[in-house]
């Protein structure tokens, strides 16, 4: 190592952003800095004092990602038709306003805050507040239209969430409304209770156009669920949901893991193995390190906090090095692919222009013998992205023929005939269906670390691409909605529990 390289290695990372005081929610300056191989944050409120937290658990990985993917090339352009004006400034004017730098890639609509469970970690406050938020059928249709009217990208991926969305009997009709409005990908975020018990209702969701089931799945030990969900009978229910999915012909399930230190951080390897064993129906594992919103108590934060690189290291250990920390890329890695495909196909593709520290992902390819390897062993993913940047720059310079010729450089980078064939289909057709065929032959593992008031970073939130549509005609970034806006928005459209029970004559947990 040269003296110059050594000096670069010794440089400690430091930058500044804006955060929130966890007590009063006023904006405060935030310092992000490196110490002992970890990236920390610190912020001070004039009234409530100093707060510190872990920002990113691996400084080496952080600096690599920051250098490669935190730059202007990966910035979005926001909405051409913003829904609100700037009055108080970000994050109080959501949304989306002109300060937001990305458009909606995944829209979320909470169809109820009622639930048939009472999970202590739920950020949607299901069953914990004394009101019922349940938008009307027409309000939900209007929210779908709101997302579809976004420009330059009409949101075509939608999640129905809650609460527990499956306790609405009209959910199949709402899915059909989304498909009618032109949404290509519709997923349902669920604990699976009703789908394990009522296969006919499950099939109605599929027949209506549901693309994917977003299944709460914290592990394969009942002790986990006692801590995270307050029940000890859920493992068999998860198995039953997969069994019913096979019976009705659904082959796209995402296992959604709420990850907490000391609870299920030793279970990631077994969850990956379970996904591999069930890869005929499991398409993805989405790991969500716990955020301190909802009913997760403040005094539990320190012992339960776990960051994206902590999760990556645990997976490396628990897969015996099959998936290393260098097999992951930040969630904005696909930007050049969207841009390159756009100039070649002369159409707009969704751009994942979120902040690179919001999450990370990798893909694993399952072999016939049940073994698996990360896609980085089959494809030079960084060269792949570099070629797509070259394709994009050729296209925007008007050299469309050259851009198309550069596409020929992509497939020789792929070692596996299976993966090469799948990618060829995606590259040549550039369709949602081709991408779906690719996703059905691999398993994605994603880690999304949603923010709370303790680790809130304005720089991150302004680049968010996962947005809630709400009945007031606004679209709000995920982390501002759950940290700041949820209660006030829901209360505008809520009725009291007593009013609801008098109107319907049922328990809050019962389907209506």
Model-derived regions: residue spans:
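Radical SAM enzyme core and accessory elements
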Residues: 1-87, 93-95, 346-512
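Conserved alpha-helical substructure of the radical SAM core
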Residues: 37-62, 66-190, 194-200, 204, ...
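Broad gene-expression machinery/nucleic-acid interaction feature
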Residues: 40, 106, 212, 254, ...
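Glycine-rich, histidine-containing beta strand-loop boundary motifs that form or position
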Residues: 109-111, 123-126, 162, 190, ...
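A short, flexible beta-alpha/helix-coil linker loop
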Residues: 125-130, 220-223, 292-293
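Short glycine-enriched, charge-decorated loop/helix-capping segments at active-site entrances
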Residues: 126-134, 227-233, 300-301
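Radical SAM/AdoMet-radical enzyme domain recognition
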Residues: 141-159, 168-289
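Radical SAM enzyme [4Fe-4S]-AdoMet core and its adjacent flexible, acidic
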Residues: 247-433, 437
